[in-house]
């Protein structure tokens, strides 16, 4: 069992298909990519994980994967770095999104998706963008773990 940082790319905010899945093992730093022909392997990896980590995975990625992949991830420990970012510093300079974190950590998110209709069909560039998001999110996860050392709920 493993702890995975993961991300998906799909065809919009109310998706009808997932284009790709990328996951990183938190301990080994191994990165696993699954394009649109390998999604079942990606679903299997997510199902075998102990903990799933990602940015807005509670609000987007997990519900989309469960609905379109026909899998159940409800038994997983979930760490949503967007939720933690807002919890630890509600008035964080910049914003809580991955793009803002990328600027703060000196690891820019990338600009894929700014072109019109970028999310309609799978492209290899989309997979690379997803991979970069996962690497950035791993950095965010580590930064938030460091921040949490001084966090005391009131």
Residue ranges and their predicted role:
Residues 64, 68, 101-104, 140-147:
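Generic, well-ordered alpha-helical scaffold segments in large soluble proteins
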Residues 116, 120-154:
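Mixed-charge, glycine-rich, non-catalytic linkers/tails in nucleic-acid processing enzymes
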Residues 29, 90-94, 144-150:
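Short helix-capping/linker segments at secondary-structure and domain boundaries
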Residues 1-92:
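Conserved RNase H-like, two-metal-ion catalytic cores of nucleic-acid enzymes
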Residues 73-76, 109-111, 152:
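Short, flexible active-site-proximal loops enriched in glycine and acidic residues
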Residues 78-104, 126, 130:
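Short alpha-helix plus adjacent loop in nuclease-associated cores
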Residues 100-125:
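A short, charged helix-loop
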